[in-house]
Design a protein with these regions (language model features):
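Helix C-cap/helix->beta junction micro-motif
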Residues: 136, 199-200, 227-228
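Solvent-exposed loop/turn segments at secondary-structure junctions
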Residues: 118-121, 145-151, 173-177, 209-214, ...
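Active-site segments of SGNH/GDSL-like serine hydrolases
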Residues: 170-174, 189-222
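Serine-esterase "nucleophile elbow" of acetyl-processing enzymes
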Residues: 90-167
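Catalytic-core regions of hydrolytic enzymes
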Residues: 145-165, 176-197
Length: 275
């Protein structure tokens, strides 16, 4: 993926979008071009960040924006401005709460199971799980397979035992890029989590960088992570690995440099539960 695409997929465009939109809100009505241009740029940047939410929430947000921009005479400017500002700060507050790396809680472990696709299985070089195994001095059971999606991950989860107490999921990218319908992805992910989230097991999952047509993927991930008490690593961390210098061999699969960065990220994220 290009740096520009990864910037939007990481969700980082939300924050300059908020700034532009608020500048438009504060611009005097006697400057209609500035007000309109700043507002539209802000809206595009915010929507392009793909905050995971149901489509009806996007509809309400855009509707409030249009009410503010093309305010009917019976609606006061103060009321329209207040409605839009509240909507903007609601989105901002929700996403800021999802921005930080979660503090992963659970019993300390010396082993880790990984269920993933080619990003974790590795292609043409050392995989990040292999690098992590040596750098952290832990035992890793890497069940990942190239081309795997959430349906394939069910078979991987079946290979786990009661002694596997720490699981990392890096799955869903092939579903997203392969055009799997969002509802099918959600059903597959729920089936996987029902299988994987056993009592006494800590489960961590990478949030997927998103594109506008697949926002429902992110919404399903967050909803199911809450339901099954899964720790979700925010998408910006994964996107930062991919957009680093020389991080990928083909724009998507990790190079040796990218694999080392991914291993360092996972080691940092799991540090509270790895020994």
């Amino acid at each position: 993926m290009s740096p520009a695409a990864l910037y939007f997929a990481s969700g980082e465009s939300l924050y300059p979008g908020v700034v532009f939109l608020l500048l438009g809100v504060m611009a005097p009505e006697r400057w209609p071009v500035l007000r309109s241009l700043s507002g539209w740029i802000g809206l595009i940047l915010m929507v392009g960040a793909c905050p995971p939410a149901p489509w009806w929430a996007y509809g309400i947000f855009v509707g409030i924006f249009l009410l503010w921009l093309f305010r009917p005479k019976k609606l006061s400017r103060a009321a329209a401005t207040m409605m839009l500002a509240m909507a903007v700060f609601l989105v901002l507050g929700t996403e800021l709460s999802q921005r930080k790396m979660p503090v992963i809680a659970g019993g300390t472990e010396h082993s880790l199971v990984i269920i993933g696709d080619s990003l974790s299985s590795g292609i043409g070089g050392p995989s990040w799980p292999t690098i992590l195994e040596h750098s952290a001095g832990i035992s890793i059971k890497n069940l990942s397979r190239p081309g795997a999606g959430v349906r394939d991950a069910l078979a991987m989860a079946a290979q786990m035992t009661r002694e596997d107490h720490l699981l990392l999921l890096e799955i869903g990218g092939n579903d997203l890029l392969g055009g799997v319908p969002s509802a099918d992805f959600a059903n597959g992910l729920e089936g996987l989590l029902m299988k994987a989230c056993a009592p006494g097991r800590t489960v961590v999952m990478f949030e997927l960088p998103l594109i506008p047509s697949k926002i429902a993927y992110g919404y399903s991930q967050r909803r199911l992570a809450r339901k099954y008490h899964v720790f979700l690593i925010p998408k910006r961390f994964f996107a930062d690995v991919l957009r680093g210098p020389h991080a990928t061999s083909d724009g998507l699969h990790l190079s040796k440099v990218g694999a080392s960065r991914m291993a360092a990220l996972v080691e940092q994220a799991l540090s509270p539960v790895l020994q």
